[in-house]
Amino acid sequence: MDAASGILPDYAELFCRSNFSFLHGASSAEELVERAAKQGYRGIAITDECSLAGAPRMHVAAKAVGLPLVVGAYFGVTPDDAAPGHDPGPGAFGLVLLAQNREGYGNLSELISWRRMNAPKGTYRLTPRMLAAPPRALAHLRGVPDCFAILVPTYPARADVLDAQLAWFDALFGERARLGLVQLQRALDGAHREQVRAAGERRGMHIVALGDVTMHIRSCKPLQDTMTAIRLGMPIAECGHALAPNGEQHLRTRQRIAQLFPADALAQTCRMLDACHFSLDDLRYEYPHEIVPAGHTPTSYLAQETWAGARRRYPDGVPDTVRQRIEFELALIADLKYEPYFLTVYDIVKYARSKDILCQGRGSAANSVVCYCLGVTEVNPQQSTLLFERFLSRERGEPPDIDVDFEHQRREEVIQYLYEKYGHDRAALAAAVSTYRPRGALRETGKALGVDPMLVERVAKEHRWFDGSRDLLARFASVGLDPEVPLIRTWAEIAARLLNFPRHLSQHSGGFVVSRGKLTRLVPVENAAMEGRRVIQWDKDDLEALGLMKVDVLALGMLSALHRAFDMITAWRGPPLPDGRPFRLEHIPQDDEATYDMICRADTVGVFQIESRAQMSMLPRLRPRGYYDLVVQVSIVRPGPIQGGAVHPYLERRRIAAGEAHGEITYPSEALERVLERTLGIPIFQEQVMQIAIVAAGFTPGEADALRRAMAAWKRKGDLGKYHERIVAGMLERGYSREFAEQIFEQIKGFGEYGFPESHAASFAKLAYASSWLKRHEPAIFLAALLNSQPMGFYPPAQLVQDAKRHGVTVLPIDATKSGWEASLEAQPGAAPPDGRPAVRLGLSLVRGLGEEAARRIGAARAAGPFASVDELARRACLERRDLEALAAANAFATLAGNRRDALWQAVAAAPIDEAVRPALGAPTEADDVFADYRTIGLTLNRHPVALLRPALDARRLSSAAALRDRRNGRLARACGLVTARQMPGTAKGVLFVTLEDETGCVNVIVRPELLERQRRETLDSQLLAVSGVWQCESDVRHLVAQYLEDLTPLIAGLRTESREFH
């Protein structure tokens, strides 16, 4: 029947590109599925261009609404000079491939991988030869078996061209071949339809209706035009015929579709849909087999290694509680057949340890005693109230997630080990989806719309963030743009739509996928930007949704710094014990009073995890005095506890517990007391929220884990509501008040912002304490280790050096006659190892423009004897002129040539200069040296730049950081310093936190939203910022609440400083 009879024919859209066809598709998978379901489609296909990147999201969305999904891909096919019998004739055409079953999906995935790895980025077209005669290793892909193939003719179709193409197409694809008909309300649609109909009839090939969909609704057309312009690198006004002539490439109503297409072409869509039996749920991950030695099964080998590790962890005997826990975990792991996963991670960690690469597991894996015994994690589950179900349970239906951090400077060794062990065909990194950020969206959209480039740059520079088009229009108005002007309104609307849109695939920070067979038959693989690496087309969320294994091989800078510090301690002071083993983490004394005193003062610049502005503000209030306090400290300065209203109640209860405040710490029940006792009755961790659900609302452990997942997703999907009634009813049934039940639910919602797992915090707290101990007891070694581990951490080298100098560390300048590539330790006059405190000699790595190889040659030449002049150094180390100039500008020739200017002259001359002809060069001023230092090495050992300005700042009545420390609360105050950080946490409600540094320390500044809007340029662009406001000092937490800002950057014009922006 047709529309005329009153009954609409069924229809399935089989040609649909999402926004993972980058800069082609203008709608997300979720939007496309929702629209197709609303229109009553029988099903839908996802056919992104040479890609399956969007397939998992489409799968999840379609599954949620019960809409059948076909997985496929689209390819452009261009003619080639193939051998006779392979040439489809002149002209290009489109090819849609749809997987009919698991085998067809594997073939499609392998075809995509082949093209992606052997074509320039963005040019993934096929040729007839590739389809008909692929390389011998891929001969099984000839004709892409078990996939429907739809030829999409070039518009408008020509009979001779189409006949030639169909003859070739039919011979290659046979009964799987179909001829696609696209109708987009273009001028020649009637003629095109007739040509397609006639060609299909002559060839006896089924014709199938196609929508060539790139957007879910017509109103996305301006966004699609903008993306076309971005893709072509020209304004929309110059794109001409490259733009779609109308908005017909959307999911049209079935009434409209019935009017446009023949009934047989519509019926064919449903017949093909019904013939495609593949779902991404059919994918089955097979673990590698190399990890199990001969004579063992995965079960027996994991048990053997776990019990051996338990004996090492508990040399005085494995406690009964641990023994029972090991037996329980091993039984569950075996039942779920996850032993190969644990053994894969164990193998990676074993390799790293064999190469003396520092590593540590974190995240939910710290809940597992098996991981602890295997040496994957360092947190003893007995010492924390951890929850194994946060890591693994029967109800989860997917493998656990084990994250392992490695030294960031040596992680590549671990990655290459995986490639060598499993081969590039079986190992690849997970993808990360790079999306449009605020500035990029504004810039790209503005250029596409033809906005004046200078205006585009000014607006983008001043808008690091925005929240939707209304917010953006208001911000535009604040910088003098009229929101009523159509161009400005369009700019705001499209930029807001483009925000967070997928832009391209990059590589995940360390998620690795390894498989037993060819990975390309599980998921498409392509070359990563870094040579020697490959990346799959799915990200970590896709892998999780499909239950596929990922091993996180992550990089952590602090592990590099700790390892370097430990080695320096051993070299400087000798081994810590008579056995001669080097200093390591276990040799750091626990519960060191001096270390905790330093932490409580928030003296934590450079320390892991507790060095940020927010953490420093919390430290004097929470006052950690032990390891578990640090676990709480790491976790509490997070959106989850903040939004859940946990911070102030917890701090108040700490004061009550310490006898500093009146009150009583109570618990709603004995059962909840066991859950919340360690955090004084206030839920801080994700595990506690799960345990509350189990103990107080009757959830099973698996259901509690599902709640945790919903918590993590509710801001994005809003699906926490279904748990509200269950939690409240369960708590009422167990005797809790409705008020308390509602309070708990609100706290759970708060954790949806970002609740920190205790297992994660427990791992990080160990590193926080270790780095704090080093800063307190070995500050010079700690500084050298941090400098040699850059880039890492919160602070650039300039701030690390200034902080170390304030702590009495002697920092010696770069000297080509003494410095190595890295920072090193030297004895100070009158002090010697092992008891003396060393000085730090800065390394040549800081010199901008100097390569490591040149620095190594200097070191090798120096080892043969001292240098008498710059010329001799240049000759013996074979330095080029650019190397000499870089060293001279950095004042590295001071001991050979005097001041910087003389050194530069000698470097240019590259020979000793006769005193009679040497120009009379005046010595540079202190200010000259400071500016040159920042320009050439990024820091100075001379006076702080602000110290040089102190007379001028005093005249403006601007106080130093030191002078403000003792000012009374609520007094007016003025300060000035270099901007070293700007932060706006998601929980700050528009408040910006700015850190200023002067010669005496740092001032923390609070800039409220209204002031930020009034003085956006001063706030965001100043290098040297003066602030007038109200001084607040409470519980050793000090900050300046800004009322007026002044940009004094002209006073330091030309000074190159670094600041941490919005991290």
From Swiss-Prot:
Query: Which N-terminal stretch is annotated as signal sequence?
Result: none
Keyword DNA repair among UniProt keywords: yes
Tell me the InterPro entries matching this sequence: DNA_pol3_alpha_NTPase_dom, DNA_pol3_finger, DnaE2, DnaE2/DnaE/PolC, DNAPol_HHH, PHP_dom, Pol/His_phosphatase_N, Pol/histidinol_Pase-like
Any one Gene Ontology cellular component term annotated for this protein: cytoplasm
**UniProt-recorded Gene Ontology molecular function terms:** 3'-5' exonuclease activity; DNA-directed DNA polymerase activity
Q: Supply the enzyme class, top level.
A: transferase
Kindly state which reaction or reactions the protein catalyses: DNA(n) + a 2'-deoxyribonucleoside 5'-triphosphate = DNA(n+1) + diphosphate
Tell me the Gene Ontology biological-process terms attached to this UniProt entry.
DNA repair; DNA replication
Q: Which Gene3D superfamilies does the record associate with it?
A: 1.10.150.870, Metal-dependent hydrolases
Give the residue spans that cross the bilayer.
none
Query: Where's it mainly located?
Result: cytoplasm
Per its UniProt record, what Pfam families does this chain match?
DNA_pol3_alpha (PF07733), DNA_pol3_finger (PF17657), HHH_6 (PF14579), PHP (PF02811)
Instruction: Give the UniProt keywords, A-Z.
Output: Cytoplasm, DNA damage, DNA repair, DNA replication, DNA-directed DNA polymerase, Nucleotidyltransferase, Transferase
Record's subcellular location: Cytoplasm
Iron as UniProt keyword: no
Q: What is its EC number?
A: 2.7.7.7
Annotated family: Belongs to the DNA polymerase type-C family. DnaE2 subfamily.
Function as written in the Swiss-Prot or TrEMBL entry: DNA polymerase involved in damage-induced mutagenesis and translesion synthesis (TLS). It is not the major replicative DNA polymerase.
The record, for NCBIfam families, names: polc, PRK05672.1
- What PANTHER family does the entry give? DNA POLYMERASE III SUBUNIT ALPHA (PTHR32294), ERROR-PRONE DNA POLYMERASE (PTHR32294:SF4)
Q: Protein name, please? A: Error-prone DNA polymerase
> Per the UniProt entry, what species is this protein from, by scientific name?
Burkholderia mallei (strain ATCC 23344)
Q: Its gene?
A: dnaE2
